[in-house]
Amino acid sequence: MYPKTIQKLIELFSKFPTVGPRTAARFVFYLLRVSKKEREGLTSVISNLKNVNFCSFCFKTFESSETKGEENLCKVCRDASRDRTLLCLVEKETDLISIEKTKKYPGLYFILGGTVSKLKKEDIKKLRLEELEERIKNPKKFGLLDTNFKEIILAFNPTVEGEATMFYLERVLKKLGKKITRLGRGLPIGGELEYADEETLSSALESRR
């Protein structure tokens, strides 16, 4: 049996996605091998997570120091030069970052927080669907001025879960009377936006339909 501190750390690391007890134990013993300075550096960075907030509109993360405590919006949502008629829906923040890297998308985003598998009710409940509808209907309430979304882009992975999610969103959002499009050609079936190269993503954005 490991000492209590080590055991507790293993249990905490085991809660990370795709990390089991054995991998978690390797993490812990790696930390024990590095210098005290490196461990303290890691501890400091983790402690600074308390300064990370979620954007009140799109749920992207940002540090409170970025806004000087004046706003609850991320850098993208605060940018007045963005096209406020376009809203791109993504599963997670890493997908948003991948699209931003293309420098081909001028609009705003909303992070749904997951996907649905075969339209299971328990999956649907975990998504930010109510928050999404509220923000499309009344963006001003969440800090976005001069915003009127005309097109909603569904940017999800071309997987079974991604397709099911887009199908469900099309059905739910239809009543809002907005143009709804999907990413176009280029992304391989079963692939993930997070790992797509910039040229492929750019092509998919430009050929959306």
Regions found by a protein language model. Name each.
Residues 2-11, 15, 23-96:
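Cys/His-rich Zn2+-binding cysteine-cluster or related metal-binding knuckle/ribbon modules and their
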Residues 17, 36, 48, 64, ...:
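Conserved phosphate/pyrophosphate-binding and hydrolysis machinery centered on Walker-type P-loop NTPases
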Residues 105, 133-139, 149-209:
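Long C-terminal interaction/binding lobes of large macromolecular proteins
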Residues 29, 74, 87, 93-96, ...:
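Generic secondary-structure boundary/loop-capping signal
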Residues 12, 16, 34, 49-52, ...:
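Conserved, well-folded catalytic cores of nucleic-acid-processing
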Residues 24, 79-140, 145-156:
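Extended interfacial segments that mediate partner engagement and assembly in macromolecular machines
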Residues 7-11, 25-29, 40, 44, ...:
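Solvent-exposed alpha-helical segments within well-ordered globular domains of core cellular machineries
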